[in-house]
From Swiss-Prot:
Family: Belongs to the class I-like SAM-binding methyltransferase superfamily. MenG/UbiE family.
Descriptive protein name: Ubiquinone/menaquinone biosynthesis C-methyltransferase UbiE
Gene3D superfamilies noted in UniProt: Vaccinia Virus protein VP39 (3.40.50.150)
Record-level Gene Ontology MF annotations: 2-methoxy-6-polyprenyl-1,4-benzoquinol methyltransferase activity; demethylmenaquinone methyltransferase activity
Catalytic activity: a 2-demethylmenaquinol + S-adenosyl-L-methionine = a menaquinol + S-adenosyl-L-homocysteine + H(+); a 2-methoxy-6-(all-trans-polyprenyl)benzene-1,4-diol + S-adenosyl-L-methionine = a 5-methoxy-2-methyl-3-(all-trans-polyprenyl)benzene-1,4-diol + S-adenosyl-L-homocysteine + H(+)
Organism taxonomic ancestry: Bacteria, Pseudomonadati, Pseudomonadota, Alphaproteobacteria, Rickettsiales
InterPro entries named in the record: SAM-dependent_MTases_sf, UbiE/COQ5_MeTrFase, UbiE/COQ5_MeTrFase_CS
Function: Methyltransferase required for the conversion of demethylmenaquinol (DMKH2) to menaquinol (MKH2) and the conversion of 2-polyprenyl-6-methoxy-1,4-benzoquinol (DDMQH2) to 2-polyprenyl-3-methyl-6-methoxy-1,4-benzoquinol (DMQH2).
GO terms under biological process: aerobic respiration; menaquinone biosynthetic process; methylation
Protein backbone atom coordinates (compact mmCIF):
# COMPACT_ATOMS: atom_id res chain seq x y z
CA UNK A 1 0.00 0.00 0.00
CA UNK A 2 1.38 3.45 -0.93
CA UNK A 3 2.52 5.52 2.01
CA UNK A 4 3.53 9.15 2.38
CA UNK A 5 4.53 11.58 5.09
CA UNK A 6 2.19 13.79 7.06
CA UNK A 7 4.87 15.70 8.89
CA UNK A 8 7.02 12.99 10.45
CA UNK A 9 4.15 10.48 10.55
CA UNK A 10 3.79 7.77 7.93
CA UNK A 11 0.23 7.53 6.61
CA UNK A 12 -1.63 6.03 3.67
CA UNK A 13 -1.12 8.23 0.62
CA UNK A 14 -4.87 8.64 0.08
CA UNK A 15 -5.31 10.05 3.60
CA UNK A 16 -2.93 12.99 3.31
CA UNK A 17 -5.16 15.47 1.52
CA UNK A 18 -7.98 15.22 4.05
CA UNK A 19 -5.51 15.65 6.92
CA UNK A 20 -3.93 18.71 5.28
CA UNK A 21 -7.41 20.13 4.64
CA UNK A 22 -8.25 19.70 8.30
CA UNK A 23 -5.09 21.53 9.37
CA UNK A 24 -5.85 24.59 7.26
CA UNK A 25 -9.59 24.64 7.97
CA UNK A 26 -8.84 24.71 11.69
CA UNK A 27 -6.47 27.69 11.50
CA UNK A 28 -7.97 29.63 8.55
CA UNK A 29 -9.26 32.58 10.58
CA UNK A 30 -5.86 33.10 12.27
CA UNK A 31 -3.72 32.16 9.27
CA UNK A 32 -2.54 35.67 8.34
CA UNK A 33 -1.82 36.64 11.95
CA UNK A 34 0.23 33.50 12.48
CA UNK A 35 2.26 34.18 9.33
CA UNK A 36 3.18 37.60 10.70
CA UNK A 37 4.08 36.26 14.14
CA UNK A 38 6.05 33.22 12.97
CA UNK A 39 8.15 35.10 10.42
CA UNK A 40 8.37 38.44 12.27
CA UNK A 41 6.63 39.91 9.22
CA UNK A 42 9.33 38.66 6.85
CA UNK A 43 6.81 36.68 4.80
CA UNK A 44 5.53 39.98 3.42
CA UNK A 45 8.99 40.87 2.06
CA UNK A 46 9.44 37.38 0.63
CA UNK A 47 6.09 37.66 -1.15
CA UNK A 48 6.93 41.13 -2.48
CA UNK A 49 10.11 39.69 -4.00
CA UNK A 50 8.11 36.77 -5.36
CA UNK A 51 5.64 38.92 -7.30
CA UNK A 52 8.54 40.87 -8.80
CA UNK A 53 9.18 37.71 -10.82
CA UNK A 54 6.09 38.65 -12.89
CA UNK A 55 7.05 41.74 -14.93
CA UNK A 56 4.08 41.60 -17.32
CA UNK A 57 0.79 42.01 -15.48
CA UNK A 58 -1.21 42.05 -18.73
CA UNK A 59 -1.37 38.30 -18.30
CA UNK A 60 -3.53 35.33 -17.43
CA UNK A 61 -2.23 34.08 -14.08
CA UNK A 62 -3.09 30.97 -12.09
CA UNK A 63 -2.29 31.11 -8.38
CA UNK A 64 -2.41 27.60 -6.93
CA UNK A 65 -2.77 26.83 -3.21
CA UNK A 66 -3.87 30.45 -2.91
CA UNK A 67 -4.75 30.11 0.75
CA UNK A 68 -5.96 33.44 2.08
CA UNK A 69 -5.01 35.12 -1.19
CA UNK A 70 -1.83 37.02 -0.28
CA UNK A 71 -0.03 36.51 -3.60
CA UNK A 72 -3.06 37.00 -5.84
CA UNK A 73 -4.19 40.13 -4.00
CA UNK A 74 -0.71 41.64 -4.14
CA UNK A 75 -0.73 41.03 -7.89
CA UNK A 76 -4.27 42.41 -8.23
CA UNK A 77 -3.34 45.61 -6.38
CA UNK A 78 -0.17 46.07 -8.42
CA UNK A 79 -2.13 45.56 -11.65
CA UNK A 80 -4.85 47.97 -10.53
CA UNK A 81 -2.28 50.65 -9.65
CA UNK A 82 -0.64 50.24 -13.06
CA UNK A 83 -3.89 49.98 -15.02
CA UNK A 84 -2.87 46.55 -16.29
CA UNK A 85 -5.36 44.12 -17.80
CA UNK A 86 -4.77 41.17 -15.49
CA UNK A 87 -6.80 37.97 -15.24
CA UNK A 88 -6.27 36.06 -11.98
CA UNK A 89 -7.56 32.64 -11.03
CA UNK A 90 -7.17 31.65 -7.38
CA UNK A 91 -7.23 27.91 -6.85
CA UNK A 92 -7.14 26.02 -3.55
CA UNK A 93 -8.42 22.64 -2.45
CA UNK A 94 -9.53 24.12 0.86
CA UNK A 95 -12.83 25.96 0.54
CA UNK A 96 -12.49 27.71 3.90
CA UNK A 97 -9.16 29.25 2.91
CA UNK A 98 -10.63 30.46 -0.40
CA UNK A 99 -13.51 31.97 1.55
CA UNK A 100 -10.96 34.03 3.49
CA UNK A 101 -9.38 35.12 0.18
CA UNK A 102 -12.76 36.18 -1.24
CA UNK A 103 -13.55 38.21 1.87
CA UNK A 104 -10.19 39.97 1.71
CA UNK A 105 -10.62 40.74 -1.99
CA UNK A 106 -13.98 42.41 -1.29
CA UNK A 107 -12.69 44.31 1.75
CA UNK A 108 -9.76 45.63 -0.32
CA UNK A 109 -11.92 46.32 -3.40
CA UNK A 110 -9.72 44.02 -5.46
CA UNK A 111 -12.29 41.44 -6.49
CA UNK A 112 -12.49 42.60 -10.11
CA UNK A 113 -10.89 40.18 -12.60
CA UNK A 114 -10.59 37.47 -9.93
CA UNK A 115 -11.95 33.95 -10.25
CA UNK A 116 -12.04 31.43 -7.41
CA UNK A 117 -11.83 27.69 -8.01
CA UNK A 118 -11.82 24.89 -5.45
CA UNK A 119 -9.42 22.35 -6.96
CA UNK A 120 -6.52 20.03 -6.24
CA UNK A 121 -3.09 21.02 -7.53
CA UNK A 122 -2.82 17.42 -8.76
CA UNK A 123 -5.95 17.66 -10.96
CA UNK A 124 -6.52 21.19 -12.19
CA UNK A 125 -9.84 21.77 -14.01
CA UNK A 126 -8.29 23.89 -16.76
CA UNK A 127 -7.46 23.14 -20.40
CA UNK A 128 -3.91 22.63 -21.61
CA UNK A 129 -1.94 25.78 -22.47
CA UNK A 130 -4.23 28.16 -20.54
CA UNK A 131 -2.00 30.44 -18.43
CA UNK A 132 0.97 32.77 -18.87
CA UNK A 133 2.09 32.29 -15.27
CA UNK A 134 1.60 29.61 -12.63
CA UNK A 135 2.36 30.78 -9.09
CA UNK A 136 2.38 28.78 -5.87
CA UNK A 137 3.61 30.14 -2.53
CA UNK A 138 4.13 27.97 0.55
CA UNK A 139 1.78 25.39 -0.89
CA UNK A 140 3.58 22.75 -2.87
CA UNK A 141 5.03 20.94 0.13
CA UNK A 142 1.44 20.24 1.29
CA UNK A 143 0.48 18.48 -1.95
CA UNK A 144 0.34 14.68 -1.54
CA UNK A 145 2.05 14.03 -4.90
CA UNK A 146 4.41 16.90 -5.72
CA UNK A 147 5.57 15.37 -9.00
CA UNK A 148 1.98 15.13 -10.21
CA UNK A 149 1.36 18.77 -9.26
CA UNK A 150 4.46 19.87 -11.19
CA UNK A 151 3.28 18.01 -14.28
CA UNK A 152 -0.12 19.69 -13.97
CA UNK A 153 1.62 23.06 -13.74
CA UNK A 154 3.47 22.26 -16.95
CA UNK A 155 0.26 21.13 -18.67
CA UNK A 156 -1.81 24.24 -17.94
CA UNK A 157 0.92 26.73 -18.82
CA UNK A 158 1.11 28.14 -22.33
CA UNK A 159 4.30 27.63 -24.33
CA UNK A 160 6.82 30.14 -22.92
CA UNK A 161 4.74 30.22 -19.74
CA UNK A 162 6.55 30.67 -16.43
CA UNK A 163 6.34 28.52 -13.29
CA UNK A 164 7.18 30.38 -10.07
CA UNK A 165 7.24 28.74 -6.65
CA UNK A 166 8.02 30.25 -3.24
CA UNK A 167 8.75 27.62 -0.60
CA UNK A 168 10.63 27.02 2.61
CA UNK A 169 14.03 25.57 1.87
CA UNK A 170 17.35 24.50 3.38
CA UNK A 171 19.49 26.95 5.34
CA UNK A 172 23.17 26.54 4.46
CA UNK A 173 24.95 28.60 7.16
CA UNK A 174 25.43 26.45 10.27
CA UNK A 175 24.74 29.06 12.97
CA UNK A 176 21.57 30.25 11.27
CA UNK A 177 20.60 26.63 10.65
CA UNK A 178 20.89 25.77 14.36
CA UNK A 179 18.85 28.79 15.44
CA UNK A 180 16.24 28.22 12.75
CA UNK A 181 15.77 24.58 13.71
CA UNK A 182 15.45 25.42 17.41
CA UNK A 183 12.97 28.22 16.67
CA UNK A 184 10.94 26.06 14.29
CA UNK A 185 10.51 23.05 16.55
CA UNK A 186 10.41 24.73 19.97
CA UNK A 187 8.80 28.14 19.44
CA UNK A 188 6.45 28.03 16.43
CA UNK A 189 4.19 25.23 17.76
CA UNK A 190 3.87 27.09 21.08
CA UNK A 191 2.86 30.29 19.28
CA UNK A 192 0.36 28.22 17.31
CA UNK A 193 -1.09 26.80 20.51
CA UNK A 194 -1.50 30.27 22.06
CA UNK A 195 -3.00 31.96 18.99
CA UNK A 196 -5.05 29.18 17.39
CA UNK A 197 -5.38 26.58 20.14
CA UNK A 198 -4.00 24.05 17.66
CA UNK A 199 -0.40 23.05 18.39
CA UNK A 200 -0.67 19.97 16.15
CA UNK A 201 -1.25 22.10 13.04
CA UNK A 202 2.05 23.88 13.61
CA UNK A 203 3.88 20.69 14.52
CA UNK A 204 2.85 19.53 11.05
CA UNK A 205 3.97 22.85 9.53
CA UNK A 206 7.54 22.67 10.85
CA UNK A 207 7.84 18.94 10.15
CA UNK A 208 6.68 19.40 6.55
CA UNK A 209 9.25 22.17 6.09
CA UNK A 210 12.01 19.96 7.48
CA UNK A 211 11.13 17.15 5.07
CA UNK A 212 10.81 19.30 1.94
CA UNK A 213 13.55 18.67 -0.67
CA UNK A 214 16.61 20.89 -0.84
CA UNK A 215 16.90 23.61 -3.45
CA UNK A 216 18.86 21.36 -5.81
CA UNK A 217 16.66 18.32 -5.22
CA UNK A 218 13.55 20.35 -6.02
CA UNK A 219 15.26 21.73 -9.12
CA UNK A 220 15.62 18.15 -10.39
CA UNK A 221 11.92 17.49 -9.74
CA UNK A 222 10.98 20.60 -11.73
CA UNK A 223 13.19 19.46 -14.61
CA UNK A 224 11.64 15.98 -14.59
CA UNK A 225 8.21 17.60 -15.03
CA UNK A 226 9.41 18.98 -18.38
CA UNK A 227 10.48 22.51 -17.47
CA UNK A 228 13.60 24.26 -18.74
CA UNK A 229 15.69 27.30 -17.76
CA UNK A 230 15.27 26.35 -14.11
CA UNK A 231 16.64 28.69 -11.44
CA UNK A 232 16.28 29.37 -7.76
CA UNK A 233 17.04 32.36 -5.56
CA UNK A 234 17.63 32.01 -1.83
CA UNK A 235 16.09 34.57 0.51
CA UNK A 236 17.04 35.11 4.17
CA UNK A 237 19.95 32.70 3.97
CA UNK A 238 17.92 29.94 2.37
CA UNK A 239 15.04 29.93 4.86
CA UNK A 240 12.94 30.29 1.73
CA UNK A 241 13.73 30.08 -1.97
CA UNK A 242 12.04 31.30 -5.13
CA UNK A 243 12.11 28.65 -7.87
CA UNK A 244 11.36 29.59 -11.47
CA UNK A 245 11.23 27.71 -14.76
CA UNK A 246 9.75 27.94 -18.24
CA UNK A 247 7.65 25.72 -20.45
CA UNK A 248 9.52 25.97 -23.74
Amino acid sequence: MNQTNFGFKKIKANEKQSLVNSVFSNVADKYDLMNDLMSFGMHRLWKDEFIRQIPNLNSNILDVASGSGDIALKLAKKAKDRGSNISLTLSDINEEMLRQAKKKSIDLNLFQNLKFTVASAEELPFPDNSFDYYTIAFGIRNVPDINKALKEAYRVLKPMGKFICLEFSKVKESLLQDFYKFYSFNVIPKIGQIITGNKEAYDYLVESIDLFPSQDEFRIMIKEAGFEEINYKNLSGGIVAIHSAYKL
